[in-house]
Amino acid sequence: MSKRDYYEVLGVERGATEADLKKAYRRLAMKYHPDRNPGDKESEDKFKEANEAYEVLSDASKRAAFDQYGHAGVDPSMGGGGAGFGGANFSDIFGDVFSDFFGGGRGGGRGGAQRGSDLRYTLELNLEEAVRGTTVSIRVPTLVNCQPCDGSGAKKGSTPSTCPTCGGIGQVRMQQGFFSVQQTCPRCHGQGKIITDPCTSCHGEGRVEEYKTLSVKVPAGVDTGDRIRLSGEGEAGTHGGPTGDLYVVISVREHEIFQRDGKHLYCEVPISYTDAALGGELEVPTLDGRVKLKIPEGTQTGKQFRLRGKGVAPVRGGGAGDLLCRVAVETPVNLSRRQRELLEELRDSLEGDSSHSPKASGWFDGVKRFFGDL
């Protein structure tokens, strides 16, 4: 059966750069690696084919020979110079590939100790708690070391036996085409030993599920998305590995009055038609209590008043933000006969005097000009 063109195998153009070759090879190696496709002969063949293609094309002299003579220039069975390990450098590629398979580094090292997973817990707070800070108690599901076996996974008093697959080394060597790769033993996971008499409490896992109650101190000024790291409060590691961390992620609930944007707070303040026209004074809420806000006469809907320092002091330091109050003028409803009469008198008295409604007057003038131009 004739071999496919090496450029075709990797899916690159003949003028591909070294970076292009490496990227293409890594993609194929990840896709067809035997550990991802156990028992799949077709994937194994494609993996070997990609290895062979990259081994030739990543070496300048072999690539030149292939470009000139094709497979005959590099295949010893066809009279060429052959394709041994030569100048191809697979170490950097497989460092990346196997880190994806095994969680970092080829083989993971002797002993197979692995750090426990980090945990994430979403903590909901109201706005007042987020602004002022608080201390809360949380209950988190996690994995802890099994006490009866002290995390070993073996029944107390029993002794693990040497792994027959790796002979106690913790790593195995796989032949892949023209080269071999060393990786973590799939049976003992790098331990070099297997448990023949597992602990009945954890069934040989070394860890058990448990709820952990923790006290979390929330600093003042936190906002949605902020994280609090509790070091060593994640899942227990395996085979003596370190414990992971717990990340408490803040989520601030919506407030019925205030909206927050960074260190500033916003609220809408409804005022009466008469207060807007005549001016007045009203109380508005802040997180520190009520304060008086002076409303000047002629205030329009949308007017914004700034109360300095009545916002939020950021968790990372700096002065407190402001509270911005946006006025919304309410139109009176459910009027009595006398109230209607008074408003009608007011309307009649304002008729024809544009000085009382400059925006409306300007708008109507614009409308007239618009229709006059049609």
Curated annotation (Swiss-Prot):
Ranges of residues in domain J: 5-70
CXXCXGXG motif repeats: 146-153, 163-170, 185-192, 199-206
PROSITE patterns in the cross-refs: DNAJ_1, DNAJ_2, ZF_CR
Chief localization: cytoplasm
Subcellular location: Cytoplasm
The protein's required cofactors: Zn(2+)
Residue intervals of every CR-type zinc finger in the record: 133-211
One GO biological process term: DNA replication
Residue numbers binding Zn(2+) 1: C146, C149, C199, C202
Keyword Iron: no
Free-text domain note: The J domain is necessary and sufficient to stimulate DnaK ATPase activity. Zinc center 1 plays an important role in the autonomous, DnaK-independent chaperone activity of DnaJ. Zinc center 2 is essential for interaction with DnaK and for DnaJ activity.
Known partners and oligomeric status: Homodimer.
GO CC terms of this entry: cytoplasm
Record-level Gene Ontology MF annotations: ATP binding; heat shock protein binding; unfolded protein binding; zinc ion binding
Function field: Participates actively in the response to hyperosmotic and heat shock by preventing the aggregation of stress-denatured proteins and by disaggregating proteins, also in an autonomous, DnaK-independent fashion. Unfolded proteins bind initially to DnaJ; upon interaction with the DnaJ-bound protein, DnaK hydrolyzes its bound ATP, resulting in the formation of a stable complex. GrpE releases ADP from DnaK; ATP binding to DnaK triggers the release of the substrate protein, thus completing the reaction cycle.
Gene this protein is translated from: dnaJ
Pfam families, per the entry: DnaJ, DnaJ_C, DnaJ_CXXCXGXG
Similarity comment text for this entry: Belongs to the DnaJ family.
Coiled coil: none
Cofactor binding description: Binds 2 Zn(2+) ions per monomer.
Keywords assigned: Chaperone, Cytoplasm, DNA replication, Metal-binding, Repeat, Stress response, Zinc, Zinc-finger
Organism: Pseudomonas putida (strain ATCC 700007 / DSM 6899 / JCM 31910 / BCRC 17059 / LMG 24140 / F1)
Full protein name: Chaperone protein DnaJ
Residues reported in the UniProt entry to bind Zn(2+) 2: C163, C166, C185, C188
